[in-house]
């Protein structure tokens, strides 16, 4: 870092709090004929090093120069030097580690954290007047970690290499920061270090290993403490414990968890910035929220564009974090509202708002991250001139799906103006036994009904609040209104639990999914049945959702494998033996509720409901078929890592000449996956082709063995014989709701989601394979069952939670046994134990380790010389205050491509180039990262000159 220019003194104290790395300021209080400057050598200082505060441009006629610790008049003096007499006088601020030189420079030896602060040089003339005051700020890096010299206080850790392993492969449990005075070490299978679980022990003095009772013959211990496990099997997954003993008989313990890689692929991908459209389909005139998930904490600014391209003409707004200010762009329509979490609200949506939006994020390290969202806008077709007066009663679930134990608001829209009373019912049928509550408008009073559980509250606007939601609350809810002229109106809403948390562990209920969720007139819809019982006698479909002869569509008998159509059958329905039903050429009359009734083998009846939403199709020409737009469907909608997905193309142009598939939303050559020529029925792979993509003659793209980096948008570009282009997009998503289902054993296991947590974030300790006969669940912040470590105790029969001594107020227990920890701190890291008490009073235990990381701080780079000759050598060193970071070197802002002349130290913190060539000239940086963040150093420029 070069010396800064002279600044007015009033800025010195303001800038002090902004100096985050070893840095300095100079500040001249008084005018002087020669500008005195001071600089640090080296610019960045680490604990234990020496630093020289060099003085430049000293005048010859000075009488005395004095160094002070601070910037105030009464700051303690370190010492003063008089050139005429060559006498140095030490002051009260001298610590015994400072030396004053005749050129005015100050040397500080063996710097510590206590040396951080301002240092001031005062020049005094023969009249005992202060001619100038020059100040500099010294910051000292912690010595917790320096290049290739780990701190003696560094904690023992273990890393799984690779993080996940395929069955039959090998994995190295790599040990870091072994104690220097190591006597012996022991490896155990599990979290408790007891003899019966001992895999092997290693004696340092003799460099020998002895197998233990849990040794399978596939484990090898190395002299650095690491454990190699070969021919890995499913039963090898779980925790491993390392215990070390030093020569002073001190013990240290570390744990690591071994996962199968197919599991990690789906459940532990890095958090990407994603945008969610709420609602997914918005009507003209309504409001939509483009909700941003996983916005990075270290962003400088973000930009919204009404396009998939970054152009000023498409810019809606720019938000600058430092100023907390929003700058509006050319595409701003005055209907957009920007939030500092990156989200954008659009009100009074029009058809012109449909299409792609781009969110661009500028991070602290000047890296750019992009995310895209497609907004779907549906035209509202009114049957009258006064659409407001004919607005239908409707209900919205806020949020759309709810975590068990949370609250949900069933928000009512378009209540009649002359409302007299309203009634809420649980289920599809408005009958007295299922009445939750009734509300009288005139008296603003509510009366609970037979189905009221004490958790329901109705508001004056008709909305219903349901608190502490349970599994049996999930179903349809019915609202019936009565106005003053005694007219009735009915609306329904379906309450759904968030299946990413709580619904995995309850008996699987039959559910029906509408594909698509909103269907246009003339299109087809599939009512896809989930969790259909394997053993059943018959099933029947009804429209509307009441069991009567007039409403029956069809009845299927398994024994005879035959179907009997009912009075409501229209000839457009096709049923399948798994209970699902397809309807073709849908009309507006098909909208509404449908009921599936299943007669089980034990003659029990099970019912499921689905609501069909039909959108009017307004063609722009008399021949609407010819204007059908190119579209793509992901089959299935979301995919588990390692499986295959088909991007199914609809409505290809008839005069198609060729088509091109791209990875991303922009059709550019570098992102081209494959092109297909219709005339020759041949395909050519593009630069982005991975060998896993196959294109079919109907334009569809098959992607096999899907990985995390395959997620995102895909673009199809078609070219017809008249050279017209058409473009369609589709988004591929990984299904993370199958984390537990990926486990091949039925053993009780806990999964931390996410695997690595940043300080201040939340982590879910997700429990898999919870037995059905659970009586009580206990959580402990320890591997031992002790009251002082107890977080919570949950009784399933009483549906109540008793908090323990270790409860911090940040934990939440779900009925499926999972534990949510919010606002995580470093103290939350470590091992947790789940203990389950069965109804037969047997105990079952499972453990999980929580890894908590602080965001990394800024690193810096030192170089042996910034100007070197060709054929000489140079060494760059990366310094970071953070332990356990990964290091990557950058050259001219690109990842450094190592040559045979370049050597990295074991931890990659040192880069040596020998010999140096002319092409090595440029800017060098190091990037440090941990599982939750990364930062890059300021660039150091290397100049290369000829001999």
Swiss-Prot record:
Stretches assigned to the Ig-like C2-type domain: 859-943
Domain (Ig-like V-type) ranges: 35-132, 166-259, 270-378, 392-498, 509-615, 642-733, 746-851
Pfam families: ig (PF00047), V-set (PF07686)
Any one GO MF annotation of this record: identical protein binding
Keywords: Apoptosis, Cell adhesion, Cell membrane, Disulfide bond, Glycoprotein, GPI-anchor, Immunoglobulin domain, Lipoprotein, Membrane, Oncogene, Repeat, Signal
Membrane topology label: Lipid-anchor; GPI-anchor
Keyword presence, Cell membrane: yes
UniProt signal peptide: 1-34
Glycosylation sites: 57, 103, 110, 207, 224, 341, 461, 472, 578, 698, 709, 816, 823
Family matches, as SMART domains: IG (SM00409), IGc2 (SM00408)
Subcellular location field: Cell membrane; Apical cell membrane; Cell surface
Origin: domain of life: Eukaryota
Cystine crosslinks: 878-926
GO cellular component: apical plasma membrane; cell surface; membrane; side of membrane
Stated family: Belongs to the immunoglobulin superfamily. CEA family.
Function field: Cell surface glycoprotein that plays a role in cell adhesion, intracellular signaling and tumor progression. Mediates homophilic and heterophilic cell adhesion with other carcinoembryonic antigen-related cell adhesion molecules, such as CEACAM6. Plays a role as an oncogene by promoting tumor progression; induces resistance to anoikis of colorectal carcinoma cells.
Subunit structure: Homodimer.
Protein name: Cell adhesion molecule CEACAM5
Lineage: Eukaryota, Metazoa, Chordata, Craniata, Vertebrata
Gene (name only): Ceacam5
């Amino acid at each position: 870092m070069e010396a800064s220019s002279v600044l007015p003194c009033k800025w010195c104290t303001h800038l002090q709090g902004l100096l985050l790395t070893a840095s300095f300021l100079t500040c001249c209080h008084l005018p002087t004929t020669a500008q005195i400057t001071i600089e640090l050598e080296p610019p960045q200082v680490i604990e234990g090093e020496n630093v020289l505060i060099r003085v430049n441009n000293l005048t010859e006629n000075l009488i005395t120069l004095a160094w002070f610790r601070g910037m105030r008049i009464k700051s303690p003096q370190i010492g003063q030097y008089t050139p005429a007499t060559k006498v140095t006088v030490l002051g009260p601020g001298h610590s015994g580690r400072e030396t004053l030189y005749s050129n005015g420079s100050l040397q500080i030896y063996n710097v510590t954290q206590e040396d951080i602060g301002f240092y001031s040089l005062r020049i005094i003339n023969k009249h005992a007047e202060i001619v100038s005051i020059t100040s500099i700020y010294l910051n000292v890096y912690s010595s917790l970690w320096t290049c290739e010299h780990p701190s003696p206080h560094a904690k023992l850790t273990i890393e799984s290499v690779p993080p996940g392993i395929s069955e039959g492969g090998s994995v190295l449990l790599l040990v870091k920061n072994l104690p220097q005075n190591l006597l012996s070490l022991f490896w155990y299978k599990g979290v408790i270090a007891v003899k019966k679980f001992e895999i092997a022990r290693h004696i340092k003095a003799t460099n020998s290993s002895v197998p233990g009772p849990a040794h399978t013959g596939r484990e090898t211990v190395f002299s650095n403490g690491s454990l190699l496990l070969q021919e890995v099997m499913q039963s090898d997954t779980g925790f491993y414990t390392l215990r070390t003993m030093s020569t002073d008989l001190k013990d240290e313990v570390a744990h690591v968890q071994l996962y199968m890689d197919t599991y990690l692929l789906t459940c532990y991908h890095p958090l990407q910035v994603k945008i969610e459209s709420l609602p997914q389909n918005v009507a003209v005139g309504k409001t939509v929220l483009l909700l941003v998930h996983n916005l990075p904490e270290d962003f400088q600014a973000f930009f919204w564009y009404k396009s998939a391209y970054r152009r000023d003409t498409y810019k809606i707004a720019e938000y600058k974090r430092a100023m907390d200010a929003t700058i509006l762009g050319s595409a701003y329509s005055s209907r957009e509202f920007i939030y500092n979490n990156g989200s954008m609200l659009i009100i009074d949506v029009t058809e012109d708002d449909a299409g792609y939006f781009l969110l661009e994020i500028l991070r602290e390290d000047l890296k750019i991250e992009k995310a895209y969202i497609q907004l779907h806008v549906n035209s509202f077709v009114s049957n009258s001139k006064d659409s407001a007066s004919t607005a239908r009663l409707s209900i919205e679930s806020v949020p759309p799906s709810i975590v068990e134990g949370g609250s949900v608001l069933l928000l009512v829209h378009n209540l009649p103006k002359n409302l007299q009373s309203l009634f809420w019912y649980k289920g599809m049928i408005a009958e007295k036994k299922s009445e939750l509550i009734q509300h009288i408008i005139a008296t603003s009073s509510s009366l609970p009904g037979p189905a009221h559980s004490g958790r329901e509250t109705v508001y004056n606007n008709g909305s219903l609040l349901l608190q502490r939601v349970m599994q049996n609350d999930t179903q349809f809810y019915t609202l019936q209104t009565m106005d003053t002229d005694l007219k009735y109106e009915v609306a329904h809403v379906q309450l759904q639990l968030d299946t990413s948390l709580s619904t995995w562990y309850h008996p699987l209920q039959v559910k029906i999914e509408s594909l698509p969720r909103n269907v246009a007139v003339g299109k087809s819809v599939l009512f896809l049945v989930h969790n259909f019982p394997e053993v059943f006698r018959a099933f029947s479909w009804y429209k509307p959702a009441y069991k009567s002869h007039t409403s029956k569509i069809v009845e299927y008998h398994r024994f005879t494998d035959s179907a009997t159509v009912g009075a409501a059958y229209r000839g457009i329905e096709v049923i399948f033996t798994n209970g699902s039903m397809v309807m073709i050429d849908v009309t507006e009359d098909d909208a509404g509720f449908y009921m599936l009734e299943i007669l089980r083998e034990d003659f029990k009846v099970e019912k499921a409901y689905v609501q069909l939403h039909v959108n009017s199709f307004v063609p722009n020409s008399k021949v609407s078929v010819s204007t059908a737009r190119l579209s793509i469907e992901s089959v299935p909608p979301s995919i588990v890592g390692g499986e295959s997905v088909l991007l199914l193309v609809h409505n290809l142009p008839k005069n198609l000449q060729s088509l091109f598939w791209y990875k991303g939303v922009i059709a550019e050559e570098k992102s081209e996956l494959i092109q297909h020529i219709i005339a020759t029925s041949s395909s050519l792979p593009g630069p982005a082709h991975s060998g896993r993509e196959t294109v079919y003659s109907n334009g569809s793209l098959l992607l096999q063995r899907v990985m995390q980096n395959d997620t995102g948008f895909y673009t199809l570009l078609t070219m017809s014989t008249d050279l017209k282009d058409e473009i369609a997009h589709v988004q591929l998503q990984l299904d993370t709701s199958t984390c537990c289902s990926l486990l091949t054993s039925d053993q009780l296991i806990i999964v931390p989601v996410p695997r690595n947590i940043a300080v201040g974030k939340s982590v879910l300790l997700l429990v898999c394979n919870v037995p059905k006969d659970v009586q009580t669940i206990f959580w402990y912040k320890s591997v031992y069952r002790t009251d002082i470590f107890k977080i919570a105790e949950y009784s399933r029969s009483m549906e109540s939670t008793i908090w323990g001594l270790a409860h911090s107020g940040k934990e939440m227990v779900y009925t499926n046994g999972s534990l949510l920890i919010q606002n995580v701190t470093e103290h939350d890291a470590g091992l947790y134990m789940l203990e389950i008490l069965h109804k037969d009073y047997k105990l079952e235990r499972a453990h999980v380790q929580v890894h908590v990381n602080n965001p990394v701080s800024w690193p810096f780079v030192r170089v042996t010389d910034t100007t070197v000759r060709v054929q000489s050598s140079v060494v760059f060193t990366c310094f970071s205050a953070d332990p356990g970071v990964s290091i990557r070197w950058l050259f001219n802002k690109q990842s450094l491509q190592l040559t045979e002349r370049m050597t990295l130290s074991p931890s990659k913190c040192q880069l040596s180039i020998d010999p140096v060539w002319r092409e090595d000239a440029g800017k060098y940086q190091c990037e440090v990262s941990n599982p939750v963040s990364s930062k890059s150093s300021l660039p150091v420029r290397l100049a290369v000159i000829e001999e």
